[in-house]
């Protein structure tokens, strides 16, 4: 009878290890995905950071990279703890899972709280950037960011192409008679902005503001989806870790 119980204990222990090992693999992959999203945000979308002004957007990318790195490091620790069957390592692994889960929870709450604030900042700062800073001396980075924004999102002006009529750049001699910057043109050629006709200029309802807001919303949605996926995995992982730790403790005694 005792022999059967020992075999059953070994069977349960082996299956718990396999399940936790599989979880840890997907958890590690999830961490790599989180880090990849953060790096992608900084590399591919860094051209918009000078327009966004608020540090919230850039900070979110750095947080993703940090959390992703922490998840991957925790994953490596998890593999070692599972293979060695060390209770102390499993306890550390569980604590790290819990810390990461709490960080994700706090980040999710802050993202929800600050989204409206970020949206309001975008509306004010984008219009200010277009009218006051575009095309000005020592504002080459901002000018390049606005040009890229208008070409990538196929838009013109903050709310419409009419916003450019009051900009410092269009009213200056450097504009050379342009009604809008050349980056507003569907086909960019030299001085194409002199003719602000719908066949030549992007006339998008809501202008670049609507496009930029959608970009930020999609970015936060992607972060949220990845975060929720990793958080769900963590709950499963914490349960499996507790079960394996308890089984090892019972086996020891």
UniProtKB/Swiss-Prot annotation:
Question: What is the official name of this protein in its record?
Answer: Tetraspanin-11
> PANTHER family recorded for this chain?
TETRASPANIN, TETRASPANIN-11
| UniProt-annotated location(s) | Membrane
Query: Which species expresses this protein natively?
Result: Mus musculus (Mouse)
Q: How does the protein's chain sit in the membrane according to the entry?
A: Multi-pass membrane protein
- SUPFAM superfamilies named among the record's database cross-references: Tetraspanin
Q: What does the entry list under GO cellular component?
A: membrane
Provide the residues annotated with a glycan attachment (glycosylation).
127
Q: Give the UniProt keywords, A-Z.
A: Glycoprotein, Membrane, Transmembrane, Transmembrane helix
InterPro entries for the chain: Tetraspanin/Peripherin (IPR018499), Tetraspanin_animals (IPR000301), Tetraspanin_EC2_sf (IPR008952)
